[in-house]
Structure formats: structure tokens, C-alpha cells
């Protein structure tokens, strides 16, 4: 609540933090807080004008949780920064009343501290009491650092014995044996790339004679294990191993403040570095060892350290079981009762173009990928086939690319059929809204009529009075477009007033009714 002191002309802002707690700030206090914060921090809440951050802000305005999750978790887009208008993603989400987005941002480290300008602004601007209570009750220590699936998989490659069939190098020390992967360590460290390149094809074991525990701790660090232990007792050994492996960022932070190795920010930095390292390694493989299937007399590919192949319509790629197992489809093929599980170098087929297959590889190796709009529909199909269809997975990324287009590159009919075939609600809503906005151009199209019939046939044992999903969706988006609410409608589904908007709405509803009569359908 805001009030003004009549004697001094000072505006006060009252913020309620509970049933009995109140705190008053003059506008000068708030301005002072903002200036103090700006001086104290060079990275927190600084202006970020990158395209990814602006897309995050826009998604928070709209309440598009799927896009927000994708940008934060797949692309590591920062959330504690502001756009050119000084709005952070959390402020935008709370201001626009999107509770699921607010909850997600808080769980992923968004700051809302009551004694800061951005925190007070977020609380004061919250659209409803539910969001305000969520912000007030939230303690930053409650932040859920949910195991990111990508990082979790990388860690499990070292720690999960069920995935040891993907390993090809063993480090044997006095405390036991550690199973690892040549390709992964070669991608993360130039030392290992050089070391493994000198090993013969039958050499799969290296003896660790000294500091075996410290060596294992460094390996766990490289595999993103958050429980890697770095003891004070062997500082020199850890630093020596780090220097040998050329882990300059690890050495710098360990010497400065080793406790930061377990901080949230450092984990995000290492996750991004791992994605970058594996992305560069994959680019190297594609550039040097991608082979047309009509000429499989391949060049030497010993530096790819592969243990499988992935084959598109036209090309074959050396790949790694450890990464392919991120996909349940390939995991079943490589670990289940199938021929591929018994082959030394199995060939996994993916019946799509090389461009689409390379998008799949990029996603599996890095958890992110750039998808050209003209390929996005095929990517939705391949992601559905491979069961890469969970939140912020490959199907989600491809769907976002399609729905960002004002004018679709593919046929809107193909997009809707793809949505039906792959159970993708985001695409279905996009196609229905597009059809509602362009109804006058589509209503006489024979293919549109056929699509309405298909929608009617999607209801098993359809009765005469059952609704048609596509028609219901189009009617919904028409009412949303023209601002017509259910209580405004007459019994026949139209409005009885004659404002220009309502008149146009009635015309479009009549067009739909005429089409249904023509098709002898009721909905």
C-alpha cells in the first residue's frame, strides 16, 4: 500500500510481511537501496540484453513455463539479472501473476530478499496474495537444486555399476578400480586426449601408483559429482594432479576458496563447461569422421574413441554408448536382449536425414541444440520416437521453435496432425489458434474440412452430440481474440449485441456452423 506525507510530500510504501509485521519505506529509501545494491554487485541484477535472456523475460511475462524451463535448464540462462527496463524474470512473473513460473524461478535460485530493492519491488508488485505469500515464506536455503537430468547422467556413468558396460578404460589403484570413458576424459582434458591417443587398441587399464584417492576425487569432479571430496590433508597432491590434467579453473578456485567448489554457481559453471567440451568434441567427430554410407571404407577414427555407430539415411557417425544411453530407446537396444548389445561396434539406425540426426546427437551430447525452423517438425517426430519427450527435452525444444513462428513454415494442417500423432499439446494449441485467426481463409479449403472430419473421428464410438475437439479449440480462441466470455453468449452460442467486435465474432461462429451442417456434423 502506498501513501503520501502531506507535510513533507514524501511517498511511503508499506510492505506487509505477515499478520502483524509492517515496514515503511520512503521512495528515497527505496532509491538508496537500489543504488547501494548496484555499487555492491558487479554481476547480480546487471542488465542482460542477450537474445536468450530477453526470450526468458518474455516467457515470464506470458507465463510460458515450458519455455522458461528450457532456457534455464537447457541453456543455463541467468535468472538474477535484469532487462533494459530493470525487470528481472522473477519480478515479471510475479507482476503478471504466473504462480508456476514464480515457484520454478525460486526453486532454481531466483533471489527475493526483503531488504533489497529488487526484493521489495518484487513483493510490492506481486499480482495476488498467493504469490506474495510464496515470496514472503520462501527461504533461499529451501532452493531445490533438483538433479539436472543431464548432469545426473554424466555422474552416473562413473558411479552406477549398471552403466559400466559403456566404459573402456579402468584406473587401478590401491583402493580399488575406477571405470571411466576415454572419449569423455579426452573431451574434458587435453592431457587425457594425448594419453589415450598413445594407448594401443587392446590397452584398457592404467595403474595409479600414487595418491589414488585424490586421483579419484579429481575424476569425480570431472564427472560432475557434487559429492567429490577434497581434503586439506592432500592439498599439494590435488593441485599437482589438477595441473597435470590442465584443469586451470579448478586450480584457481581451489587455491582461492575450495569451499566454493560445492556452490550452486560453480556447479552451473562446470555444467556449462562440460556441455561446451562435449559439444566441441562432437563437432570434431562430425567434421572428421562422418562418412557417407555408400563409401564405408572409413579413415582412421581412433581419436574419436567410439564404441558404436549411428546411421542416418545417408551417413554413419562414430558415437559413444555412454551418451546414447541418455535415450531409453538406445539404452534398451544396447543393454537389452537385442543383437546390438552383443556386437563390438553396433550400428544404431535412425531413419531420418543427416541434418535431423545431427540435431539429435547435439542434444544427447550437450542437452541443448539449435533447430532450424524447417527441420523442427521432423525433430518432433524423431524425439517422440526416441521418447525424448519430457519437459525441456528435445520434443519440447522443437515445439518451441515451431510455435515462435508468426507464419508457420510447414503446413498448419501438418503441424496439427503432428501434434495429434505425437501427443504434443503445445503444437495443438498453436495450430488451433492459428486456424481461429485465419478462419476466413481456411473455411472453404477442402483439406480443412478433411481435418475437421479427422478430429471428429478421433473420438472413439462418437455419438451424434459429442463435441469435436478442433472446433471447440477454434471457438475458444475466437472468444479469446474478441473478448467474448461465456456469460455474454446466448443459448445458441452467439452474442445478441451489435458492436463491431461482437458482430465479427457472430459471423465467424456462423461460418463454423455452416461448415458443420455441410459436413453433417454436430458440435
From Swiss-Prot:
Domain (BTB): residue spans on this chain: 167-223, 306-373
Record-linked InterPro entries: ABTB1, Ankyrin_rpt, Ankyrin_rpt-contain_sf, BTB/POZ_dom, SKP1/BTB/POZ_sf
Gene Ontology CC, one term: nucleus
Pathway: Protein modification; protein ubiquitination
Post-translational modification: Ubiquitinated and targeted for cul3-dependent degradation.
Keywords (A to Z) from UniProt: ANK repeat, Cytoplasm, Repeat, Ubl conjugation, Ubl conjugation pathway
Major localisation: cytoplasm
Location in or out of the cell: Cytoplasm
ANK repeats: 85-114
Record-level GO BP terms: proteasome-mediated ubiquitin-dependent protein catabolic process; protein ubiquitination
A Pfam family annotated for this UniProt entry: BTB
Function field: Probable substrate-specific adapter of an E3 ubiquitin-protein ligase complex which mediates the ubiquitination and subsequent proteasomal degradation of target proteins.
Description of how the protein assembles with itself and partners: Interacts with cul3.
Record protein name field: BTB/POZ domain-containing protein 3
Organism per entry: Schizosaccharomyces pombe (strain 972 / ATCC 24843) (Fission yeast)
Amino acid at each position: 500500500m502506498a501513501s503520501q506525507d502531506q507535510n513533507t510530500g514524501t511517498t511511503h510504501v508499506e510492505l506487509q510481511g505477515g499478520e502483524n509485521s509492517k515496514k515503511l519505506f520512503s521512495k528515497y529509501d527505496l532509491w538508496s537501496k537500489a543504488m547501494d545494491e548496484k555499487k555492491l554487485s558487479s554481476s547480480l541484477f546487471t542488465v542482460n540484453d542477450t537474445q536468450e535472456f530477453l526470450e526468458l523475460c518474455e516467457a515470464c511475462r506470458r507465463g510460458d513455463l515450458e519455455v522458461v524451463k528450457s532456457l534455464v535448464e537447457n541453456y543455463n540462462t541467468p535468472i538474477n539479472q535484469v532487462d533494459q527496463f530493470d525487470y528481472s524474470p522473477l519480478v515479471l512473473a510475479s507482476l503478471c501473476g504466473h504462480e508456476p513460473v514464480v515457484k520454478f524461478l525460486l526453486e532454481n535460485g531466483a533471489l527475493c530478499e526483503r531488504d533489497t530493492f529488487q526484493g521489495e519491488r518484487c513483493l510490492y508488485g506481486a499480482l495476488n496474495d498467493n504469490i506474495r505469500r510464496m515470496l514472503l515464506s520462501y527461504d533461499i536455503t529451501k532452493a531445490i537444486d533438483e538433479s539436472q537430468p543431464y548432469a545426473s547422467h554424466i555422474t552416473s556413468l562413473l558411479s552406477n555399476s549398471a552403466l559400466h558396460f559403456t566404459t573402456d578404460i579402468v584406473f587401478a589403484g590401491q583402493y580399488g578400480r575406477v571405470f571411466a570413458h576415454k572419449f569423455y576424459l579426452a573431451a574434458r582434458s587435453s592431457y587425457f586426449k594425448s594419453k589415450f591417443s598413445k594407448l594401443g587398441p587392446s590397452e584398457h587399464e592404467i595403474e595409479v601408483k600414487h595418491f589414488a584417492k585424490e586421483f579419484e576425487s579429481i575424476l569425480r569432479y570431472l564427472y560432475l559429482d557434487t559429492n567429490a571430496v577434497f581434503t586439506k590433508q592432500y592439498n599439494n597432491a590435488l593441485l599437482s594432479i589438477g595441473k597435470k590434467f590442465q584443469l586451470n579453473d579448478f586450480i584457481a578456485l581451489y587455491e582461492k576458496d575450495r569451499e566454493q567448489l560445492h556452490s550452486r554457481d560453480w556447479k552451473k559453471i562446470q555444467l556449462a563447461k562440460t556441455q561446451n567440451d562435449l559439444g566441441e568434441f562432437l563437432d570434431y567427430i562430425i567434421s572428421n569422421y562422418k562418412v557417407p554410407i555408400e563409401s564405408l571404407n572409413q579413415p582412421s577414427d581412433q581419436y574419436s574413441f567410439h564404441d558404436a555407430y549411428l546411421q542416418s539415411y545417408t551417413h554413419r557417425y562414430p558415437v559413444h554408448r555412454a551418451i546414447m544411453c541418455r535415450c531409453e530407446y538406445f539404452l534398451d537396444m544396447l543393454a537389452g536382449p537385442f543383437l546390438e548389445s552383443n556386437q563390438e561396434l553396433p550400428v544404431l539406425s535412425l531413419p531420418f536425414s543427416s541434418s535431423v540426426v545431427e540435431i539429435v546427437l547435439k542434444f544427447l551430447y550437450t542437452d541443448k541444440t539449435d533447430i532450424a525452423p524447417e527441420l523442427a517438425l521432423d525433430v518432433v517426430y524423431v524425439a517422440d520416437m526416441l521418447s525424448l519427450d519430457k519437459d525441456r527435452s528435445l520434443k519440447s525444444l522443437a515445439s518451441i521453435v515451431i510455435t515462435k513462428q508468426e507464419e508457420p513454415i510447414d503446413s498448419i494442417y501438418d503441424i496439427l496432425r503432428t501434434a495429434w500423432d505425437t501427443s504434443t499439446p503445445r503444437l495443438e494449441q498453436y495450430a488451433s489458434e492459428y486456424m481461429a485467426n485465419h478462419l476466413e481463409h481456411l473455411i472453404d479449403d477442402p483439406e480443412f474440412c478433411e481435418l475437421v472430419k479427422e478430429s471428429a473421428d478421433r473420438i472413439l464410438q462418437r455419438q451424434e452430440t459429442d463435441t469435436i475437439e478442433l472446433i471447440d479449440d477454434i471457438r475458444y480462441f475466437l472468444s479469446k481474440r474478441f473478448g467474448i466470455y461465456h456469460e455474454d453468449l446466448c443459448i445458441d452460442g452467439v452474442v445478441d449485441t451489435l458492436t463491431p467486435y461482437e458482430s465479427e465474432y457472430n459471423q465467424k461462429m456462423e461460418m463454423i456452423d455452416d461448415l458443420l451442417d455441410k459436413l453433417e456434423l454436430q458440435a
